């Protein structure tokens, strides 16, 4: 039997219960040295179906107000018998990562290109110069970073994405400062030319959790190690630029 990891947390309230669901695997807790792994028992690495992904996100989101939560992307699996030893082996890295996100949430600000519906010869002033290029998007991202008032951020270009998605900036924001953060970036949103600035969140700090390949995942003596969905493919890497 294996365990599919949702998150590792500190200070999990005794009254916490996973969100109810009519179907899907049960949720189990494994406590080791002050850390709690939130998992589900599985017989194999789960397929990334829409219901499975939605259930994963719902469970992780239910941990948003825990003191410190280290969320994992879908598909991280360890052998259940090895889970306590795996946590113990990686406790220093896990605690360091939890310390970096303690009391914080992720706010993701999406930058969307705006396209006017005018005829070719009647372009409006806002889009007369064409849609913003990569430098223009990054300039808006830089203004957001300057105004955000937070120390940690990650900028990501959405090159090749469908639709008008162009870029995004993830910010690690203290939970109590979300409203102030939104107020600080509002002037940037109102002045952006040809770009819609769309804040989303708060979310669990996925963008600030270390990717699987950044944790020391080589199995220690006697441990079964870790694998991920997709034939061992690593979890998504952090965004291109980091504050």
Predicted regions and their residues:
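An interfacial alpha-helical scaffold signature
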Residues: 1-243
């Amino acid at each position: 039997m294996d365990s599919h990891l949702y998150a590792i947390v500190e200070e999990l309230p005794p009254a916490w219960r996973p969100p109810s669901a009519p179907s899907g695997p049960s949720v189990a807790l494994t406590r080791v040295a002050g850390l709690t792994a939130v998992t589900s028992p599985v017989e194999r690495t789960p397929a990334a179906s829409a219901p499975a992904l939605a259930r994963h996100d719902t469970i992780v989101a239910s941990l948003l107000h825990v003191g410190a939560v280290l969320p994992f992307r879908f598909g991280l699996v360890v052998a259940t018998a090895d889970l306590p030893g795996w946590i113990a082996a990686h406790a220093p890295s896990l605690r360091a990562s939890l310390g970096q996100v303690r009391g914080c949430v992720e706010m993701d600000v999406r930058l969307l290109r705006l396209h006017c519906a005018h005829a070719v010869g009647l372009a409006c002033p806002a889009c007369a110069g064409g849609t913003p290029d990569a430098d223009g998007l990054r300039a808006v991202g830089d203004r957001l970073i300057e105004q955000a008032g937070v120390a940690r951020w990650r900028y990501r270009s959405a090159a090749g994405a469908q639709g008008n998605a162009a870029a995004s900036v993830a910010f690690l924001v203290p939970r109590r400062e979300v409203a102030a953060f939104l107020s600080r970036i509002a002037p940037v949103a109102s002045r952006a030319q040809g770009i819609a600035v769309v804040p989303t969140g708060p979310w669990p700090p996925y963008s600030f959790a270390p990717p699987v390949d950044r944790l020391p995942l080589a199995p220690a003596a006697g441990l079964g190690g870790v694998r991920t969905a997709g034939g061992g493919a690593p979890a998504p890497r952090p965004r291109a630029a980091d504050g």
